Amino acid sequence: MAKFLSESQLGHFQSQGFLAGLDVFSIEQCEKFRTRTEEFEHHYPEEVSWALDIKCNLLFDWVYELSTFPLLLDIVSDLIGPDVLLTNSIFRIKEPFGSTHYGWHQDAARIQVNPAFVIVYISISDSTTENGCLRVIPGSNQQIKPFYLTSYADRQVARVNEVDESSAVDMVLQQGQVGIFDCNTIHGSSSNNSRNRRFALVNDYSPAIAQQSVGTGSGQLVRGSNSRKLWGEEPKPQGSFTQGNIIGRRMILNTYPENVLMGPLEKGQQPSFADQQF
């Protein structure tokens, strides 16, 4: 039995591939999170580009804390079952009048995951049409569409060949609300044309019974059990941006390099990711 979502919401997610406007976090929680992030940006400007990127949940205890908020995990469990792995956290910050945007894509295009994982967009600031909120194509979660590869943030990313944008839905969210979408849902966003930062944390949650089409994934067990051992288990961060956390993230990405964000490796290819060198 679902703990939070209604039968109507569950049905909508299954058929349309997304839910929006779920009230989860308080303004106080969001402001505290934002303050911690901006303090890090101030003290470690040279590390921001990689530390707030792939698997930042391994680096910062306050990212892990927000990502494992009980109400949020109740909602995720309603969608993917009782055994839940947090497989990635990544910041999505758009500066005022900036050019950052994301073309139409499906996160599981290069490495498919079955059963599907879900992606949670946590709106730390308001997310509006003007500041480049997330946009989704309803019903596009039913199959992987043809795609091409392009370079973004020093890695290869998939972009859908053709999209009917007339059906797109803007996922407008207030501060503290979350939007959730299936890993196969086509989504993207435009640039920020407002005077304020658009600030979000985006998390991937996978059912522990899921398997990747390529390689072996890894994640932090945040609900239930990982009894089938289909995923490598990641540690909880101890403190914020410690040397131990940085080394731990490096070990995970070297041991389990084939994840949905980094994509599959070619034969003989070595893992490549941004990191701090000691």
Feature map (PLM): residue ranges:
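Non-heme Fe(II)-dependent double-stranded beta-helix
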Residues: 1-113, 232
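Conserved hydrophobic/aromatic beta-strand scaffold that supports enzyme active sites
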Residues: 2, 18-20, 24, 119-123, ...
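Short, solvent-exposed loop/turn segments at secondary-structure junctions
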Residues: 26-27, 92-94, 109, 127-129, ...
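Non-heme Fe(II)/2-oxoglutarate
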Residues: 43, 185, 190-278
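Short, conserved beta-strand element in jelly-roll/cupin
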Residues: 105, 112-129, 172, 204-207
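Short, surface-exposed loop/helix-turn segments at secondary-structure junctions
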Residues: 106, 153-165, 197, 215-222
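Double-stranded beta-helix
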Residues: 129-190, 210
